[in-house]
């Protein structure tokens, strides 16, 4: 069943996870908190270098943003691991070339330097996309249905007012 979820942001594993003594993965390690929206909705015309950043914005693969009939379905595209991988790699490459973004992140001592973003790209190209969590906004009934799916290990909620 398709769930009624608002935009879903997926957290992607971009480096090897540290394991504790019993081989249990330590999700509190210093893995960068980075990912992508897997059901995007775009309402503006954006242009980018499609050769340099293929599939940067799924569903908006044409430069002619005025013709909605030519847009791909972003949710369908991102169901394919190869499309999701290409999209995420393009996002990381795009970020690694944004000098203002990198300067801002550097001041915050983040994991988002050009070198670290390129290392993330290498990891994704070698290991593929591994989503380890996601965030969304949904009502109680939707989350209860979602919690019954076998792929869902745990749900953490906060009330939004």
Which residue ranges define each predicted feature?
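Short acidic amphipathic segments
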Residues: 143-158
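Loop-rich non-cytosolic ectodomains and luminal regions
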Residues: 1-130, 134, 157-161
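Helix N-cap motif at beta-to-alpha junctions
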Residues: 136-143
